[in-house]
């Protein structure tokens, strides 16, 4: 693919961009990081990568750059074709999609699959080996079910969903269009509901459902539990990393992102575009406002306002946490100073004449 063709494909995905070819129309065959790229590959640079010096060293044949005239001039000095956009990382993601097509099995049903006669399958569905589809399931068009997927009775999957190997979707779960569920995930299992009694624990049946809206992605070995009543809902375009746990009855907004090992207890309400970094824990029925951010390992026990950035355990405003952390690192020094000060005061007290 020539540089000029590549730009046409890229603009079709991201919209208009500014581009410049210094020396001809090079042949391109792939993408790579700027410090690893070889001849024939496209690479990118943004202000956050810290790799700006690689413009003079990279073997890449073309670059995706931020709107920075200095960087563009450095690329031109090496006769490298470049394009610029306000979001170079997004353009690079689109560039990957130009050259790389993920594995997609052909439509059809593997002979080892077990499909209940009452299940409804759409057009061009791919059903892999040993898949089990329960009674009254409804599968949309262009859905892919990889090997060993299990759909309990009454599950619905929207068009173009992809369910990876060894995932399980429990009864009556509703999965929207364009959702991706990665290997080992469990959607709609029973929530952790028990009532204490004199003799132990009384199990509360979990009669609710799980709803994933359009474009949700669930990482490997994650779990989203159904509630005793009502629903656990994940908003459109929300992305969950591997090993994320969503407790029963949680309400997650749209376009949220939760990194690995995030854990939400039951009944948590999360607004839109919230970011929870790795290993964040959220206590029962906590509310988190739109666009809030919690840094890694934060422990959230109370309400978080919209737009807030919190850190630490228990979670506090990030600026306060940074100041506290700076003091914490100096505690041994401060302790020694305080101990010396106490000793000096004690000596002064001993030397002071009694009245």
UniProtKB/Swiss-Prot annotation:
Single GO term (MF): N-acyltransferase activity
Alphabetical list of InterPro entries matching this protein: Hexapep, LpxD, Trimer_LpxA-like_sf, UDP_GlcNAc_AcTrfase_non-rep
Reaction equations catalysed: a UDP-3-O-[(3R)-3-hydroxyacyl]-alpha-D-glucosamine + a (3R)-hydroxyacyl-[ACP] = a UDP-2-N,3-O-bis[(3R)-3-hydroxyacyl]-alpha-D-glucosamine + holo-[ACP] + H(+)
Catalytic residues in the record: 248 (proton acceptor)
Alphabetical list of CDD domains matching this protein: LbH_LpxD
Biological processes, Gene Ontology terms: lipid A biosynthetic process
Family: Belongs to the transferase hexapeptide repeat family. LpxD subfamily.
PANTHER family tied to this protein: UDP-3-O-ACYLGLUCOSAMINE N-ACYLTRANSFERASE, UDP-3-O-ACYLGLUCOSAMINE N-ACYLTRANSFERASE 1, MITOCHONDRIAL-RELATED
Name the record gives this protein: UDP-3-O-acylglucosamine N-acyltransferase
Organism: Synechococcus elongatus (strain ATCC 33912 / PCC 7942 / FACHB-805) (Anacystis nidulans R2)
């Amino acid at each position: 693919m020539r540089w000029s063709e590549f730009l046409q494909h890229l603009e079709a995905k991201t919209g208009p961009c500014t581009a410049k070819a210094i020396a001809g129309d090079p042949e391109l065959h792939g993408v790579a990081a700027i410090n690893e790229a070889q001849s024939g590959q496209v690479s990118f640079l943004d202000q956050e990568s810290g790799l700006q010096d690689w413009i003079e060293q990279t073997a890449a044949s073309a670059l995706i750059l931020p709107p920075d005239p200095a960087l563009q001039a450095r690329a031109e000095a090496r006769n490298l074709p470049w394009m610029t956009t306000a979001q170079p990382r997004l353009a690079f993601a689109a560039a990957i999609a130009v050259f790389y097509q993920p594995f997609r099995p052909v439509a059809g049903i593997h002979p080892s699959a077990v499909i209940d006669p009452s299940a409804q399958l759409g057009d061009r569905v791919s059903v892999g080996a040993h898949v089990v589809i329960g009674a009254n399931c409804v599968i949309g068009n262009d859905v892919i079910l990889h090997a060993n997927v299990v759909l309990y009775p009454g599950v619905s999957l929207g068009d173009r969903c992809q369910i990876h190997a060894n995932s399980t979707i429990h009864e009556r779960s509703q999965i929207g269009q364009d959702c991706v569920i990665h290997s080992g995930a469990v959607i709609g299992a029973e929530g952790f509901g028990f009532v204490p009694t004199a003799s132990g624990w009384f199990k509360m049946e979990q009669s609710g459902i799980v709803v994933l809206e359009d474009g949700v992605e669930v990482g490997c070995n994650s779990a989203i539990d159904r509630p005793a009543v009502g629903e656990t809902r994940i908003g459109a375009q929300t992305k969950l990393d591997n090993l994320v746990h969503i407790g029963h009855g949680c309400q997650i907004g749209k376009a949220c992102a939760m990194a690995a090992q995030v854990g939400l207890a039951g009944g948590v309400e999360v607004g839109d575009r919230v970011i929870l970094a790795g290993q964040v824990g959220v206590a029962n029925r906590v509310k988190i406002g739109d666009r809030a951010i919690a840094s890694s390992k934060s422990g959230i026990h109370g309400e978080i306002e919209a737009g807030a950035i919190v850190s630490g355990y228990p979670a506090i405003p990030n600026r306060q946490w940074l100041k506290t952390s700076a003091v914490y690192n100096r505690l041994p020094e401060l302790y020694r100073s305080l101990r010396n000060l106490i000793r000096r005061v004690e000596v002064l007290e001993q030397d002071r004449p009694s009245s």
